[in-house]
Amino acid sequence: MKALSKLKAEEGIWMTDVPEPEVGHNDLLIKIRKTAICGTDVHIYNWDEWSQKTIPVPMVVGHEYVGEVVGIGQEVRGFKIGDRVSGEGHITCGHCRNCRAGRTHLCRNTIGVGVNRPGCFAEYLVIPAFNAFKIPDNISDDLASIFDPFGNAVHTALSFDLVGEDVLVSGAGPIGVMAAAVAKHVGARNVVITDVNEYRLELARKMGVTRAVNVAKENLNDVMAELGMTEGFDVGLEMSGAPPAFRSMLDTMNHGGRIAMLGIPPSDMSIDWTKVIFKGLFIKGIYGREMFETWYKMAALIQSGLDLSPIITHRFGIDDFQKGFDAMRSGQSGKVVLSWE
């Protein structure tokens, strides 16, 4: 079958021909319809330090997808041929304390689809049926293909009560923009997003944020004054991994504020911990999605009117995958969707 693989320990992704995956007793075989390119896939393409330590070569990559069930393991119940599905890309052990307690998103033995095992950038994918999620008929293939990153946004944004709150989102990448849209949709008062990339700030404006702030040109404190905010932000969603953005968030949080961190900062990032202590801030780390509460919330948010369509800015057939990666690497894109049909 046709697949996109990391073939060499160098920059690039290559179109390859690989055997179709075998279906285990508890697995589903999925014929892929659409896939989306994640920032993780760009890291793998670039072959950065993290990728060199993490990714086995050669391997089929990718973990954002929607497809159709075409094969079912003999122990699987609850699925039928033709079901349209996406799936949780974190495969968990089922045996550790967190898994047994129902906190599977905190499994210490998590394996990533397209990271530690073959991924979805292929004509067919096998995953455990436990990880599959049926897509409602009124959600398009394009939107279903970005459920994985949308789930990161939903998990981060809904970590805290947002109704009536002032929310700061640092980082206007696709996940940050989707998190901002979720916050606004569920009843936040002011949702302010910051970045230095004007293309992505304009995407955030299309998604309905209160203010999209280019911090290279505007002062965040001036924006707060413009909005009549006198006590700081109640909730911070750190999506950038950029130390200056996180320090600015600490400066502008209200006392008792709550911060959810999805962005991955440098391991040696320094901050003024006295601000965390004396402001009584709560900081929560986010990894992936809650299984499977986040998935149900994603479907419900879209079905209740949240419009994510502006975040998908580029669409290509799979034979033009290089154009998709070029768009992602340029920084002048939202989500990029590749069609396998």
Curated annotation (Swiss-Prot):
Binds 2 Zn(2+) ions per subunit. Pathway: Amino-acid degradation; L-threonine degradation via oxydo-reductase pathway; glycine from L-threonine: step 1/2. It holds the Pfam family ADH_N. Its EC number is 1.1.1.103. Keywords: Cytoplasm, Metal-binding, NAD, Oxidoreductase, Zinc. Its cofactor is Zn(2+). GO terms for cellular component: cytoplasm. The keyword Transferase does not apply. The active site is at 40 (charge relay system), 43 (charge relay system). The keyword Membrane does not apply. It is an enzyme of class 1 (oxidoreductase). The record marks 148 as: Important for catalytic activity for the proton relay mechanism but does not participate directly in the coordination of zinc atom. Zn(2+) 1 binds at residues 38, 63-64. Belongs to the zinc-containing alcohol dehydrogenase family. NCBIfam families: PRK05396.1, tdh. Catalyzes the NAD(+)-dependent oxidation of L-threonine to 2-amino-3-ketobutyrate. This is L-threonine 3-dehydrogenase. It comes from Klebsiella pneumoniae (strain 342). The lineage of its organism: Bacteria, Pseudomonadati, Pseudomonadota, Gammaproteobacteria, Enterobacterales.
